[in-house]
Amino acid sequence: MQRPLIVAASLSAAIVALAASAVAQQGQLQLPGGGLKPPPPPPVRPYQQVAVTPPAPFDDPSFVAFRKQLADVVARKDRAALAKLVVTQNFFWFQDKDLADKRKSGIDNLAKAIDLDAKGGPGWDTLAEFADEPSAAESPQQRGTYCAPADPGIDAKAFVALGQATGTDPADWAYPSKDGIDVRAAAPPNSPAIEKLGSVLFRVLPDSGQQDDPNQPLVLHVATPSGKTGFVDAAAVAPLVADEICYAKDSGGWKIVGYLGGVAQ
């Protein structure tokens, strides 16, 4: 995903470079009749460890208070109150370009970006996760705009080399949100642990998803640097590439000013 306006310098540059490399390496397969299908995922094999430093909390007291206010509004699913926490004009919504409709209000653009108004849609849950996210980082290109979650600390060159060596895309990678998570032999949470992951990148395999029993927690099927495969609790994992929500502070306090990512258009 390109982010023409808001870009976190070194890691985002590495992600763009690796994404371009992955597209060039993988291509697509031609099907009879002229159709295309994605290539098979790269094989699982051991890979070089790349250390990760999780993003630090943005502990500005006024921002912490704003997040609490946002969490309260989201818990009530109060759209009118939410509108007061979003800029009325000049809201931006980037995927490969700015998708915001400048004729509409900020809340209407935010709602479209996260499917807020869809019955049973993910919008309110998405906002709840952002309200709970303590990190945020100022954009080098737009001072005074802070986007969350902030990028983790990673050696950009090592990450590009990792992606090229494994033939993977940036979206295939994640890291533990806390140091030391168990990798289990099977999806059920009582399965034996086969390895413990520290603060390093690990590969998320494409068959990750909800277990057959909806009462069981969401797990991710992963490949560790040692070349083993197993399952980790999705709640203990942060994806390397994810949507971001952006904030800015004016005389009236903090406001939501933009969104990076969102529902496919």
Predicted features, each with a name:
Residues 1-10:
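Bacterial N-terminal signal peptides that target proteins for export
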Residues 17-21:
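N-terminal signal peptide c-region/cleavage motif recognized by signal peptidases
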Residues 29-72, 84:
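Short, low-complexity N-terminal intrinsically disordered segments enriched in polar/charged residues
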Residues 78-89:
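Short, well-ordered alpha-helical segments enriched in acidic and aromatic residues
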Residues 90-107:
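Short, charge-rich amphipathic alpha-helical segments embedded
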Residues 117-175, 221-265:
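Boundary regions of SH3-family modules and the immediately adjacent low-complexity/disordered segments
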Residues 194-237:
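SH3/SH3-like beta-barrel superfamily modules
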